[in-house]
Amino acid sequence: AMEGGIDDVGLGVLFGLELYRYEFAGILMHAEHLEAVHGVGPHTISVPRIRRADDIDPSTFSNGIDDDTFAKICALIRIAVPYTGMIISTRESQKVREKVIGLGVSQISGASRTSVGGYTEEIRPHDTEQFDVSDNRTLDEVVLWLMKMGYIPSFCTACYREGRTGDRFMALCKSKQIQNCCH
C-alpha cells in the first residue's frame, strides 16, 4: 500500500486463527519493517479476537486466547509501538475493554453494528452479522463510561482533514507534539 502512495496505514490481526505468538511477532515485525523501509510506522494497530457469528463457533479454532493473554498482547504492543493508536472493538466485553484501555488501548467503538445495512432504521436480522457484538451499550453509554473512568472521549478527525498523515503525523506523534495540535 505504501509503495503505491498510501502514506498512512493501519495494521491488524484477527487473533485466534493462528498461534498468537506467531501473529504477535508478525505484527511487530511488520511495524518495524514499515519504519525501516518507509520511515513511517503504523498509524493504528487493531487487535480483534475471533468471536461467535452465525456460522462460526470460536471453539472450533484451537488457537483462541484468554483474556489475560489478550491483555498482555495489548500492553506489549503499547510498549513496542508507543506512538500508534491501538483499536479494540465491541467484539470484547465491557470488562475486557475497561482492562485494556488502562493498558494503552486508545480507540474503541461504541454502538457498533456488524451486519450489512446495520445502521438503517429498521431492525436487521442477526444472521447477517459479521460477528456477535459483546458490548451492546449505546454510544452515549460508552461515552459516559469513559468519562467516569477519567478519560475525555474524542471524535476528532482533524489530523486527516488537515493532512497530518504519514510522515507528517509520525513526526508529531513521536516527538509528542501532536498534543499541541489538539484543542
Can you annotate each of these PLM segments?
Residues D8-V9, P153:
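Hydrophobic beta-strand scaffold residues
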Residues A36-H183:
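Auxiliary Fe-S-binding modules of radical SAM enzymes
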Residues A1-D7, L14-V40, I50, D57-D68:
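Conserved non-cysteine loop/helix-boundary elements of the Radical SAM core domain that shape
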Residues D7-D8, G85:
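Residues at the starts of beta-strands that form the adenosine-phosphate
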